[in-house]
Amino acid sequence: MVATPLPPTQSPRHPSLQELSLSELQTWLDELAERIITGETLDRATAIALTEIEGEEKILALCAAADRVRQACCGNTVDLCSIVNIKSGNCSENCSFCAQSAHHPGQDSPIYGMKTPEDILAQARAAAAAGAKRFCLVSQGRGPKYNSPKSTEFEQILATVRAIIAETNIKPCCALGEVTPEQAQALKEAGVSRYNHNLESSENFFPEVATTHSWRDRVETIKTLKAAGIQACTGGILGLGESWQDRVDLALALRELEVESVPLNLLNPRAGTLLGEQSKLDPFTALKAIAIFRLILPQQIIRYAGGREAVMGELQALGLKAGINAMLVGHYLTTMGQPPEQDHAMLAGLGLQGGEAPIPGEYVRASQVREL
């Protein structure tokens, strides 16, 4: 099916969405969800118009429309993954939010070299026991592309990936930074099927995030990985100080790149970083953003990532009714997550089940087969 853009929401005959009554807005959103489910794409003007929606009741109406799209396009399986910080601290990059950057001397993040394959394998087994289906090896630094010729770290990572495949039932992923085409191919051959490399924010806002590398550097890395046949796990962070236009433009860039998985981190400010005094997002602002991402990316895996506990608090479950269909379980890179048992109980209470969610197109194709 060839996707066609949705018509703009605003015209001389159509008021701002915020001017609609709740019932009028619900009707409009129901129609919007149905058009997206049947294959139309959300254009930028309509997405920007959705950002005008304010007030808890109206935001929940937006979430309900996004949840309808999620159910139709992705089903009720919530993709569960876990991560391990295999090398921490003293990072060369100056990302404003990150406690691992050597540019933020006031932070107190742990600093250690590459973990042993045995340590990583033990954590992979623990992640599998907690219900995770994927396990991502995350390392600080700009990436293996810039490793010293004498470094053996990349080869050690490849060996660890092979060991995880041989000795567990969990799928290994990596988040190592920039890679060459040859390194991407080596990761693919070792068994890495998905790689995390976030855009963090829009191209326009990115200079506020980091200046030691560019947004385009990140895009090129994603293209290199996809050219090697590796799925892209690519998203960003909400709450860096970006505008609503930046959030929409990030989602549109992810759609253009055809990424498979979209982790949405909610900034949990870390002391000693440039954003250490930044206010956390309001939970309903986060919900609105999640819902808009789902409407722009109807078939993508959209993942609750870092900061969900700190930002959403008791409203975490609402994210799973606003378009989220994946979660990172266990601990994060430098902060603690909630116990996996609590996550599984939350899913069960919503009638959802943890597992491995389909990549874009798979669930729709499966549904079409079932209807024949």
Curated annotation (Swiss-Prot):
UniProt key word S-adenosyl-L-methionine: yes
Matches recorded under PANTHER family: BIOTIN SYNTHASE, BIOTIN SYNTHASE, MITOCHONDRIAL
Subunit details: Homodimer.
Entries under CDD domains matching the protein: Radical_SAM
Domain Radical SAM core: 73-308
Pfam families recorded: BATS, Radical_SAM
Biological process (GO), any one: biotin biosynthetic process
Protein task: Catalyzes the conversion of dethiobiotin (DTB) to biotin by the insertion of a sulfur atom into dethiobiotin via a radical-based mechanism.
The protein's annotated pathway: Cofactor biosynthesis; biotin biosynthesis; biotin from 7,8-diaminononanoate: step 2/2
EC number, UniProt record: 2.8.1.6
Reaction(s) this enzyme catalyzes, per UniProt: (4R,5S)-dethiobiotin + (sulfur carrier)-SH + 2 reduced [2Fe-2S]-[ferredoxin] + 2 S-adenosyl-L-methionine = (sulfur carrier)-H + biotin + 2 5'-deoxyadenosine + 2 L-methionine + 2 oxidized [2Fe-2S]-[ferredoxin]
NCBIfam families hit by this protein: bioB
Family: Belongs to the radical SAM superfamily. Biotin synthase family.
Residues involved in [2Fe-2S] cluster binding: 136, 173, 233, 303
Residues involved in [4Fe-4S] cluster binding: 91, 95, 98
Top-level lineage group: Bacteria
Names of required cofactors: [4Fe-4S] cluster; [2Fe-2S] cluster
GO MF term set: 2 iron, 2 sulfur cluster binding; 4 iron, 4 sulfur cluster binding; biotin synthase activity; iron ion binding
SUPFAM superfamilies: Radical SAM enzymes (SSF102114)
This protein's UniProt keywords: 2Fe-2S, 4Fe-4S, Biotin biosynthesis, Iron, Iron-sulfur, Metal-binding, S-adenosyl-L-methionine, Transferase
UniProt protein name: Biotin synthase
This protein's encoding gene: bioB
